[in-house]
Amino acid sequence: MPKRDDIKTILVIGSGPIVIGQAAEFDYAGTQACLSLKEEGYRVVLVNSNPATIMTDAEMADKVYIEPITLDFVSRIIRKERPDAILPTLGGQTGLNMAMELSAAGILDECNVEVLGTDLTAIKKAEDREAFRDLMNELGEPVPESDIIHNLDEAYAFVERIGYPVIVRPAYTLGGSGGGICHNEQELIETVTSGLKLSPVTQCLLEKSIAGFKEVEYEVMRDANNNAMVVCNMENIDPVGIHTGDSIVVAPSQTLSDREYQLLRDVSLKIIRALEIEGGCNVQLALDPDSYNYYVIEVNPRVSRSSALASKATGYPIAKLAAKIAVGLTLDEVRNPVTGTTFAHFEPTLDYVVAKIPRFAFDKFEQADRRLGTQMKATGEVMAIGRSWEEALLKAVRSLEIGADHLLLEEAENADEATLERKICFPEDDRLFFLAAALRRGQTIEQLHEKTKIDLFFLYKLSKTIELENRIKENPQNQEILAEAKQAGFSDAFLATCWNVDEQAIYDLRKAQNLFPVYKMVDTCAAEFESTTPYFYSTYEEENESTRSAKESVIVLGSGPIRIGQGVEFDYATVHSVWAIQQAGYEAIIINNNPETVSTDFSISDKLYFEPLTLEDVMHVIEIEQPLGVVVQFGGQTAINLADGLAKRGVKILGTSLEDTDRAENRDAFEKALEILQIPQPAGKTATSVEEAITVATDIGYPVLVRPSYVLGGRAMEIVESEEALKHYMTNAVKVNPKHPVLVDRYVSGQEVEVDAISDGVNVLIPGIMEHIERAGVHSGDSIAVYPAQRLSIQVKNTIVDYTTRLATGLNIIGMLNIQYVVDGEEVFVIEVNPRSSRTAPFLSKITEIPMANVATRVILGENLIDLGYTPGLAPEKQEIFVKVPVFSFAKLRSVDTSLGPEMKSTGEVMGKDVTLEKALYKGFVASGTTMHDYGTVLLTVADRDKEEAVELAKRFNRIGFTIMATKGTASTLEEASIPVSQVKKIGENQETLIDYIRNGQVTLVVNTLTTGKRPERDGFQIRRESVENGIPVCTSLDTAEAILRVLESRSFELESMNASEVKQPKSRV
């Protein structure tokens, strides 16, 4: 079938900000789709609210709208651009839900817009729990016994009939939001209440739990001619009961017999044909390990996280081909871009094994509930490729960057028996390490299978790894065992520990027997056809398939898995750096291990190595490629941390030298540099012990800001107001010693300002100055950033430009740097300098039209800013106003405190842009998912230090028609200022308390500032958590509340009676 010529313009809906359950995989899918449609000659209009994505670059579509993905804004874009069709299946759950909303509101009919890929009936059949169950019954496909419920009474009735445990699956939600396994009435009440709130159609499916069955996924494709094929089948190591996004996954499946494989393959193809999906689809199935019985769990009628994994695991570009199928092309007429000779209907064949391990953010959230269930909690994932499951698994473990280079975690090895049993029977994020610890202590694989229902095959493979460990320890420096260990995926670092030598000694031992990895190509066809894909993985075999080209090359280190503090912004910079290297005439090589991202799409770079970002693995690639040098500025802290080891091995680090990077990151060296440059910073010192920290804090005066040196994302950072709190921090948050000092600074409560700049060593370009709405003390990644800065005087701006220029040249920065300042009146202090790309670089690149990573890379390669066409100094400011608003995933992470402070908590960001600050903020808030009520009730409960400021806010809220509710202390302050307020009871008082009002939906906004002490038993924690669970916006900073208020004021009209001044409002009390 030829492609359709009756449509000219296609609207692609993106997935919005990164949240748990919907991450960088949709930037990858959206980028592929936009380019694929443009390649076919269509005019592409894109809407997405996330500025940190490649897909929102101007080159990706004919028209790019960085606007909220809401019915209001998408309808406006449709009316303006008049697309012939929309493609919603590449924007995750956001895209699907948006298409359903547009249809229900009549917009698609009104504007005559067709839905491509998967029609709305199919989306409804797959997403609506009742329609899906009916379709499966029609097809004769088994689904677990279930019932659709809309309230708690219906849930009780179902449980009475079939008993516990039951699984709750809300309709139309993402990453299992609001769902879970319930073993008793208390869990049922919590989960069903949450699920009904989060489901846009107030509907949940309650089903009999089949926890313990094997979970298997099939990634399938179908075209308009009803050709259908399987791209990849994957097996979850964890059985049913743990969300697939939180499971360790292997591809292809390892434990299915041919009969089982074919049975489930046929079911998957039958389902995609019945749904008449044109494009990609993910089918999840549960298989009884003791029979051929199976159940269909669910179907995602769209490109998903699993599609990204399947694409990278096989090399088959699902999203790219799904876009082509959506416009009428068929699988047998689209060439497979990997081989260039075969067509897309050939099912990929793998002659290797792929392992995926999720990456969690529990290092950031110590209070979080780490237990895994049907609601996803991972922020990202890593993938590794090997010739055996053992090799792929160990490579994936060391890709995680959790301080483990092997299946060995101190906490697991030192755990007492009770903890070990609990961690094995009730899975948490680190269960793999506890399984290894149990095997080391002599538990059998049969015992572990009984407790976990993990297939014996995987446990046997794990036990073989432990056995090999023992043989390694018993035979130091044995060459045969060394070769066997390397083939099984063991790292040099772990072998060095076993043999009590340093890592270099292991390397020398391998060099003596020429024991080095070779690189194999990922080609989709197990070498059956000729292939030239520049996509490689390492293994210890004979034949090497990667050859060095005659062209000079540059290696760019990626940023690894997505986690809080190091998100998709760094992948964005990596991709732009690669493009700049190619433009400069070099071969660009990427090393990375994140299957979700654009950088690991093999068509981006000249060569892609899918490898762990460890010194050993990176050095092997460098030895084979012999590059001109390595770029570490764009891979976040991951890449920066490798620079020292690489330089010691004689590798040229391009851009800012290692010594100068250290001068910016090492406290004492940085202080000396500031002294020479005569740039002020808040008073502070480095402490190497608890006593020293107390002395420093006493000298400079509380409050103080304490943090370990060398951190990204403000990890273990806190504002401390007393000696007692400082002792608590020093003993609980950090392991302080001379090797790992702690920084103690005077806390300046001023206005925080952030600058990204590019330096060629002589000239310094500052694309823009951003101010934060929240004052210093809230992490820059969690603050609302505004460009151009609205509250800075000309003098302050000039000072910032002067200091930035002096810092860049004084620290010999070549490439990018990010500086954070705090402004107190007209005084400017420097807080920190990061000699690398930053979280704000994509945002600033988009709005100033200066492609920062691209320009910085050209500078790193030796060009200067003036020759590249840039004038040094501050670039001319734009007329429009842009805001970057953080987005949080608190709904997924129960028991995490939502209060903002120096430790970063946001998972993503959105952008708002308009002609006034209020309009830009409105767009930003709406895009971030904040519900903006024009009237309602504000609950104020603030710390004593904030009461004076809260009075002004309350007056303004009252003026535009909001009712004010407050707890006793805050209410008294407001009453004294003659503000009408309803006093509510605190938690624990026996009458109706503020928690009841929150639960009953009587509150529309909560403003709650932190009393000192972070322990969750405090009332504030409960207020904040309840608000999140009930979908009520919470401000833990008065600055954020003031920003929301500004927006509401700009949307309201003045309503005053002519004789208003004569009448005093009575006080009311609830």
UniProtKB/Swiss-Prot annotation:
Swiss-Prot/TrEMBL catalytic activity: hydrogencarbonate + L-glutamine + 2 ATP + H2O = carbamoyl phosphate + L-glutamate + 2 ADP + phosphate + 2 H(+)
Residues that coordinate or bind Mn(2+) 3: Q820, E832
Pathway assignment: Amino-acid biosynthesis; L-arginine biosynthesis; carbamoyl phosphate from bicarbonate: step 1/1; Pyrimidine metabolism; UMP biosynthesis via de novo pathway; (S)-dihydroorotate from bicarbonate: step 1/3
Single Gene Ontology MF annotation: carbamoyl-phosphate synthase (glutamine-hydrolyzing) activity
Documented EC number(s): 6.3.4.16, 6.3.5.5
Function text: Large subunit of the glutamine-dependent carbamoyl phosphate synthetase (CPSase). CPSase catalyzes the formation of carbamoyl phosphate from the ammonia moiety of glutamine, carbonate, and phosphate donated by ATP, constituting the first step of 2 biosynthetic pathways, one leading to arginine and/or urea and the other to pyrimidine nucleotides.
Identification of the protein by name: Carbamoyl phosphate synthase large chain
